[in-house]
Amino acid sequence: MQKIFNFFPLSIYKSSISLTDSEKKTMIDDIYEMEKNSKNVKYKTKTNSWTGDTQGFEFLHNNSNFDKLFKEIYKDIIEYLDNLDINHSKLNIFFQRSWATISRNGEKIASHRHSQSHISFAYYLKKNDKDSKLIFFDENKNNEIIPNLFDSPSVAIDGIIKKRGFLNAPIMTFPTEENDLVIFPSKTLHGTEKNMNDGERISISADIVLLAKDSKNLEHLSPSIDEWKLFSN
């Protein structure tokens, strides 16, 4: 009997966090105020979403109005690590940066990765069913037996790929709803489709760093920040 075996997956974690309308409104109003007080206005273009980390608001985890949300997210981060069979009791887990994004008609978040961290997430604070989707890009293309076979427009037009699926897709669109939380490795290339409606999507993202509590005999993993020393003159 013939069988296909699939190895080396990218595992994306999705959960849902329920907050009261009042709690969500407080955060949304806070985010609008941040947008109004943007520190880097020229960076924002007509086709790109507003991103708080580029506008001087990259530490939402230190804002008391977001405390409950980040406590709930922490629980899901632990669940995510459990699903990967990672012993998080040996790790110190830090929210490094966290920010809001606002996407309106004609705007998107360009493809990017978070190279400075280990785990990233997106929480959808405000979203409707017609909003653009999250996209993940496959950079490894382990099944691509011919270079550019999976992402060549001419190959697609010619019908050489009969059907797109998990075995041959260069990108995956990932549907989400309001209140959804999506967790993934920071190194994963991702972005969003262009928003094509008059709605408004507000999401919260963050970068998470994991350090070894005890680095004795470890070749890899960064040691506890308590052991670091700041350069000084």
Where are these regions (language model features)?
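Short beta-strand segments enriched in hydrophobic/aromatic residues
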Residues: 125, 188, 208-210
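Non-heme Fe(II) oxygenase catalytic core, chiefly the N-lobe of the double-stranded beta-helix
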Residues: 28-34, 68-143
